[in-house]
Amino acid sequence: MRNYRHIEVKPIAGALGAEIAGVDMARDLDDEVVAEVRHALLDHLVIFLRNQKATPQQQLAFARRFGQPIEYPQLKGLPEAPMITPVVKLEHERHNFGGIWNSDTTYLVEPPMGSMLLAREVPPYGGDTMFANQYLAYEALSDGLRKTLDGLVGISSSAKADVTRTREDALKQAGAGATPKTLQAEHPIVRTHPETGRKALYTSDAHTACIKGWTEAESLPLLRFLWQHQVRPEFTCRFRWATGSLAFWDNRCAMHNPINDYHGFRRVMHRITLAGDKPR
């Protein structure tokens, strides 16, 4: 286990996830603190900060210490901070944003390396987010299946993401009823993390349409097995939100799933995604 001098790191599960103490997003952080937070992210795949009181501009400044914020495709950001996407579910809505296991926007040629979600308003119960370790998911496969997967390419599509899972008000604001442009990209089913060198599964029911060179009928049996395998309980952690909580996860090796179990209540989150590279 890595020794930290400037922050406190407390794992929340055996598979992944750790709460970080000693970090205030509203302040200008020392380089040493930023370096340790980055190490904690690489070690634990998703990290959590509590009791943050940062403004949108302070949240953006914090995010820029770890990468380049980018706009979320097809949805508008805050007027005063376009790189921050409001993730909102209102009392009358039934669907939540991204309500399925996924790694963010893999239908982009260069998907984001990480995402930050800051809780502004949370329901009295429910609305947790689950995360799954894709290093462990890959390493738990048999040698034979790992050899089969190495070299396979998945085709990701924004059409597969199913826009009906996102809140209708946000979509109306984004395009005034216009049909969103379908985005598509090809990525390896097994990617190598550019910083750790470890291999991770990189496919999801949310975005992967089929395997390149295979028909959909041929692809689905293998993909469905992987989608179930990727989120086995022993690969996961679950985070309970409170106002001022921040989650920062590594999309290159972790999946997430926002639980939609708080109907009748309002939930408001501010999300930032950080630019990534082309998976290899």
Protein language model features and the residues they cover:
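Non-heme Fe(II) oxygenase catalytic core, chiefly the N-lobe of the double-stranded beta-helix
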Residues: 1-246, 251-280
